[in-house]
Amino acid sequence: EAGEECDCGAPANPCCDAATCKLRPGAQCAEGDCCEQCRFVKEGTVCREAKGDWNDDSCTGQSADCPRNGF
């Protein structure tokens, strides 16, 4: 939702302040295939295995989302 940095529905998430829906100090992310322990995983980490004609999808190191790298 607008103004939220993370999903504050789960107070157990150590990366997200459930009261404010903002990332805790020092956290880069709260969830995602490229987020681990509140930090973006390093560039080149495979986040989705190759399928058919598609190549492995790899994290960018700049986002918690796993991008579609394509062919």
From Swiss-Prot:
Any one Pfam family match given in the protein's UniProt record, by short name: Disintegrin
Residue stretches making up the Disintegrin domain: 1-71
Disulfide bridge partners, by residue number: C6-C21, C8-C16, C15-C38, C29-C35, C34-C59, C47-C66
UniProt tissue specificity: Expressed by the venom gland.
Record's keyword terms, sorted: Cell adhesion impairing toxin, Disulfide bond, Hemostasis impairing toxin, Platelet aggregation inhibiting toxin, Secreted, Toxin
Assigned GO CC terms: extracellular region; plasma membrane
Top-level taxon in the UniProt lineage: Eukaryota
Main location (coarse class): secreted
One annotated GO molecular function: toxin activity
Motif (Cell attachment site): 51-53
Subcellular location: Secreted
Job of this protein: Suppress platelet aggregation induced by ADP, collagen, thrombin, and epinephrine (IC(50)=170-330 nM). Also dose-dependently inhibits the adhesion of human melanoma cells to fibrinogen but not to fibronectin.
Subunit architecture: Homodimer.
Record PANTHER family: ADAM A DISINTEGRIN AND METALLOPROTEASE DOMAIN, DISINTEGRIN AND METALLOPROTEINASE DOMAIN-CONTAINING PROTEIN 28
Additional record remark: The disintegrin belongs to the dimeric disintegrin subfamily.
Family: Belongs to the venom metalloproteinase (M12B) family. P-II subfamily. P-IId sub-subfamily.
Protein's name according to its UniProt entry: Disintegrin ussuristatin-2
Source organism: Gloydius ussuriensis
Organismal lineage: Eukaryota, Metazoa, Chordata, Craniata, Vertebrata
